[in-house]
Amino acid sequence: MAVGLFGGSFNPPHDGHALVAETALRRLGLDQLWWMVTPGNPLKDRNHLAPLGERIAMSEKIARNPRIKVTAFEQALGQSYTARTLEVIRARNRDVRFVWVMGADNLKNFHRWQDWRKIVATFPIAVVDRPGSTLAYLSSPMARAFSSARVDEDDAGTLAFRRAPAWTFIHGPRSGLSSTALRSAKSG
C-alpha cells in the first residue's frame, strides 16, 4: 500500500489544502492520504491557533475523498516535530510505502524544521505547486542540498517505491487560498 502523509496546522484548512491532497493522490498513485492535523507548529505563533478539535472537524468537511483520512495522532504521541512523528509512523507500519506531501509554500522554510535532513532521509517527498512558489522552490536549501535526489515529475508515480532521499516537484492546478490570509480576513 502507498500512503501520502500530509501534515500541517490547517489553521484553518481550506480548499487549497484539499487540492494539494487530491493532486498528490492522483499524481503519486497513492492508495490513501493521511491528512495529519498537528496540535501545534513550533515555528508558528500558538496564540492564533484554533482548537485542535475545530481544525480536525473543518478538515474532515473539506477532505471529501474517502481515501483521505484525517487524523490527529501527533497529539496522542505528545509530538509536534515531523522528524519524530515520521520515525514512529515508519516503526508502526513496516509494510506501507509512505511519501511525505507538502505544499511548495512550505519549502522555503523547510530547512528551519527540526531535523529537516532526517525528514528527507526518512521518506520520499512530494512538493506540490502553490501560487508564488513555482520558481522559488529551486533556490530553497532543501532543493539545492538534495538536487541529485530529485525525481522527474513524469516519474512521480514511482516515488512511493523509491528509497529516501528522493523528491519531486508536482505542477498542477493551484489555489490562491492561504490560511494566513483567511485568518487575517476573519480578524480584520
From Swiss-Prot:
UniProt xrefs under HAMAP family: NaMN_adenylyltr
Catalytic activity, as annotated: nicotinate beta-D-ribonucleotide + ATP + H(+) = deamido-NAD(+) + diphosphate
UniProt-listed CDD domains: NMNAT
Pathways involved: Cofactor biosynthesis; NAD(+) biosynthesis; deamido-NAD(+) from nicotinate D-ribonucleotide: step 1/1
Gene responsible for this protein: nadD
Cysteine-cysteine disulfides: none
SUPFAM superfamilies per UniProt: Nucleotidylyl transferase
Entry keywords, A to Z: ATP-binding, NAD, Nucleotide-binding, Nucleotidyltransferase, Pyridine nucleotide biosynthesis, Transferase
NCBIfam families linked: nicotinate (nicotinamide) nucleotide adenylyltransferase, PRK00071.2-2, PRK00071.2-4
GO BP terms in the entry: NAD biosynthetic process
Organism of this sequence: Rhizobium meliloti (strain 1021)
Protein family membership: Belongs to the NadD family.
Pfam family of the protein (one): CTP_transf_like
Role: Catalyzes the reversible adenylation of nicotinate mononucleotide (NaMN) to nicotinic acid adenine dinucleotide (NaAD).
GO terms assigned for molecular function: ATP binding; nicotinate-nucleotide adenylyltransferase activity
Record has GTP-binding as a keyword: no
Superkingdom of origin organism: Bacteria
Catalytic activity, EC: 2.7.7.18
Keyword ATP-binding assigned: yes
Protein name per the record: Probable nicotinate-nucleotide adenylyltransferase
Upper classification of the organism: Bacteria, Pseudomonadati, Pseudomonadota, Alphaproteobacteria, Hyphomicrobiales
EC top class, as a word: transferase
